[in-house]
Regions:
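A sequence-level/structural motif corresponding to short, flexible coil/turn segments enriched
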Residues: 1-197
Length: 197
């Protein structure tokens, strides 16, 4: 459900996007042409398995194109950003590809949602991408929930990848009871700050 409001919070328009099954909404951002691009999960059928779903709309919420990515298992998108080199970088998680369980799933597309490359990251347990931001050197920093590595239960992970999706480094933070990360921001001089609970 995409809703546009004015500065007073009054609704200008709204549009419902999806199938007759349980689709999932992730992130939505405004694009340079005044439209919007959304990422989430499109239900494959009634069994609740989804594919990563990207929807591009114009400034009034009318769909201009859609793309879906993934395999026969459940895959979903959680975040998206506009790449400075053109196109979009999509973050999510996949059960169709990777090392088993749920893995981090990154897809790079052109301006029309055509895939240029995709990569997975993670171990044999569940690792789920939560948010992605641009790094100062042109790569990307990913915040994720990790069970494959770290101190046990659900720890927070930070993953640095290049602009081509190659892993540069990864870190995990957390204790035996788990520490979910809630926000990741670039501050200055190549440094980052993360809020956890």
């Amino acid at each position: 459900w995409l809703i546009k409001t004015n500065q007073s919070g009054l609704m200008d328009w709204n549009v419902c996007l999806g199938t007759n099954y349980n689709d999932r909404a992730g992130q939505a951002i405004q694009t340079q042409d005044g439209g919007f691009i959304l990422v989430g999960g499109k239900a494959q059928n009634s069994n609740d398995n989804t594919n990563v779903w990207v929807i591009k709309t114009n400034s009034q919420g009318d769909t201009t194109w859609t793309q879906s990515f993934g395999g026969s298992e459940s895959d979903s998108g959680t975040d998206i950003l506009v790449d400075e080199n053109g196109g979009y970088v999509i973050l999510g998680d996949t059960e169709s590809y990777g090392n088993g369980g749920k893995d981090i799933y990154v897809i790079k597309t052109d301006l029309y949602g055509e895939q240029e490359w995709s990569k997975t990251y993670g171990g044999g347990s569940d690792d789920s991408g939560q948010s992605i931001i641009k790094a100062s050197d042109g790569g990307y920093i990913i915040r994720y929930i990790v069970e494959s590595f770290g101190a046990g239960n659900s720890s927070v992970g930070i993953l640095k990848i290049s602009q081509d999706g190659d892993e540069i480094w990864s870190k995990t933070i957390g204790g035996s009871y788990g520490i979910p990360g809630n926000s990741l921001q670039y501050i200055d001089n190549g440094n980052y700050v993360m809020i956890c609970s």
